Amino acid sequence: MAASSDTGLDVTGGCLCGAVRYHAHTVNREGYYCHCRMCQLAFGNTRAAFFNLPKASVRWQGEPRYFRSSKFARRAFCGNCGTPLSFEYLESKHMDLSGGSLDEPSLLTPTSHFAIEKRVPNWHADDGLPGTRLDEHVKLTERWTQNYGSDVGVAAARET
């Protein structure tokens, strides 16, 4: 269910088994695809679909479980069925909810790709959307390098 207004969009979503639900308010209808190796493993897919919104706008019904995927980030999921629900940097006021967990995923439109150097070529269809390499996100790359060396992703998740 969704309600739209000039100031944004109210959306609902949750996990496969229904134990964890959310209601959220987003100010835009834009989503993105992440191709980083960590998201590939967390979602069991070649990419993850997300939309970004303020953490304060998300209300959970049922408690998600959290996996600390690095020293500075965590991922919410359903402890019963395992559905990936969100990604967030611990200190950020924003978070990403998974596009596939929306009750109406078609309400949002993907507008870009992130971590395009990690795209799996034989699983990628060129949709014409712009893409960003991880190393173009300087602050994130510096943070990863300081904490984990050159491995951007998998070692961090397996260390925590």
Where are the predicted features?
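A short Gly-Trp-Pro
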Residues: 2-14, 19-160
